[in-house]
Regions:
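P-loop (Walker A) phosphate-binding loop of NTP-binding proteins
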Residues: 8
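Glycine-rich phosphate-binding loop used to anchor ATP phosphates in small-molecule kinases
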Residues: 49-91
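Hydrophobic anchor at the beta1->P-loop junction of P-loop NTPases
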Residues: 5
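Walker A/P-loop
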Residues: 14
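Small-molecule kinase domains that catalyze NTP-dependent phosphoryl transfer to phosphate-bearing small molecules
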Residues: 112-154
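Conserved phosphate-donor/acceptor-positioning beta-strand/loop module used by diverse small-molecule
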Residues: 86-106
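Conserved substrate/cofactor phosphate-moiety recognition/catalytic segment
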Residues: 18-63
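ATP-binding Walker
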Residues: 11
Length: 161
């Protein structure tokens, strides 16, 4: 299984990744974890360093893996990166959630979980999702408002076709 799951912040990527780790034998990796490893155990806060130096190293190493389901936020993979991934047999899976629901989740996280307010970035993330979908590199779009079990089934279904 070789897959890239791309979702906007707040779309449930980490929840789905945790579900896969707890309920399947599928090898799972997350961009944030890999960036943290490369940055001496601290999540990189310097956006330029993260995107220009660390993320390309993560992507290069990841594209050579034989069996992995890789969860990532938007904007790390360029269209060329995604095309290379497809050429190497990766399926590109997109988690989709509307702006209204993303804003609700954002408000809840800010108020109840102490997260930073991501509202100013959400529209740009949605545009990235549309761009890669319109470029034809996405194999399947999954409604991120479904249950984690259903999302897991949909993702796994991509690999049995």
């Amino acid at each position: 299984m070789k897959g890239i799951v791309i979702g906007v912040s707040l779309s449930g990527k980490t929840t789905v990744a945790k579900y896969f780790r707890s309920n399947t034998s599928i090898s799972v990796s997350e961009m944030d974890e890999e960036l943290t490893k490369l940055n001496n155990g601290k999540y990189p806060t310097d956006v330029e360093h993260k995107h220009k130096s660390l993320a390309p190293k993560v992507i290069k190493g990841f594209l050579n893996k034989k069996d992995v389901l890789f969860f990532t936020n938007t904007d790390y993979f360029s269209l060329d990166d995604l095309r290379k991934a497809k050429d190497k047999g990766f399926k590109i899976i997109q988690l989709e959630l509307g702006l209204d629901e993303l804003n609700k989740r954002n408000k809840n996280r800010v108020k109840n979980e102490g997260y930073d307010d991501l509202s100013k970035w959400l529209e740009g993330m949605i545009l990235y999702q549309k761009k890669i979908r319109n470029a034809g590199v996405v194999d399947i779009v999954i409604d991120a408002s479904l249950s984690v079990e259903r999302i897991s089934e949909e993702i796994q279904g991509v690999f049995v076709k």
